[in-house]
Each structure stands twice: as C-alpha cells, then as structure tokens.
Curated annotation (Swiss-Prot):
GO terms for cellular component: BLOC-1 complex; transport vesicle
Keywords: Coiled coil
Ranges for region Disordered: 1-24
Ranges in coiled-coil conformation: 101-183
Keyword Coiled coil among record annotations: yes
Quaternary data: Component of the biogenesis of lysosome-related organelles complex 1 (BLOC-1).
Family: Belongs to the BLOC1S5 family.
Protein name: Biogenesis of lysosome-related organelles complex 1 subunit 5
Taxonomic classification: Eukaryota, Metazoa, Chordata, Craniata, Vertebrata
Amino acid sequence: MSSSSSSSSPVKSTGSPFIQSLKPRESLASMGSATQLVIKDIGEIHSRLLDHRPVIQGETRYFIKEFEEKRGLREMRVLENLRNSISETNEHALPKCTSVMQDQLASVLKKLETANHTIHRLQQRELENAKRSASKAGEEKMRAHWEPVMKEQEQKRQTVDEEHRKAVMRLKEQYVTMDKELSKQISF
C-alpha cells in the first residue's frame, strides 16, 4: 500500500473494492502510463483516506496488547498479594494460633476430664438410687402382695382357733357330761 511499489508490474490497485470494480484490469493495461499512475495514486489516496481497516486493526492489536499487559500486571499484583498474605499467615498467625490452641486445648482437656469424672460419679449415684428404689419398690410390691395373703391367713387362723375353742368346749361339756354319768353310775 505504499507508493514505492515497483513499476514493472501492471497497475497494482490497492484501493477499495469499489474502485477496483469500476475498471477491469484489461482496460488498465491499455491506458497510458500516466493514467495508470493517476489511478494508482487515487487508489492509494482512497485506501489511506477512506479505508480505515489497517488503522483499526493496528489500534485493536495495540489495545489488546496493552490490555493483556495491564491484566497480566494486575493478576501478578493479586498473586503477589496472595503470596504475601499466605507467607504472613504461615510465619506469624499460624504459630500463634497453634500455641494458643495448645494452651487452650490443655485446659479444655482438664475441664473435660473433670466433667467426665463428675458425670461418672453422678451416674453411679443414680444407679445406686435406682437399685435402692427398685429394691424398695420390690419390697413394697411384695408387702402389697403379702398383706392380703397374711390377712387371709389370719382370718383362717382365727376361724380355726374359734373352731378349736368350740371343739374344746364341746369336748369339755362332753367330758363333764360323761363324768356326771360316770359318777351317777358309780353311785349306783
């Protein structure tokens, strides 16, 4: 697209497709060299003034290049900040947190063992109380079961005693009667 192209080739039109479509190539060869140069110059002027594709492409490439460089620099800064933050955390915060955790963990472990021991004692007491309650409940249940049996036995004993007393009384009366009869018979 420069004016320094060789003149040995027939007219090399670098202009817009519109200009190229106006004249066929064969007609350009039949024209004179002055006309060819004018057409060539017009094509170059047209391409420089009206054809902005190369400029736009160049600007686009430049913008993309600058954008990628800035983006790369921004990403590098972000990565560098992350690396610094991680290094600081590893060097300062992590050891501090670890030591605090170890200190607190020891005290928490002691408290946990104490609580565990206390809970174990409470469970033992509850178990003993449950056994006593079960034993008392069993005794009360047994008493409740045996009370009617004992009352029944007492009633039967009283009935038997009453029958025995009545039988003894009858026997005494019988012996008294027999003794009277015997004494009557002896006196005869």
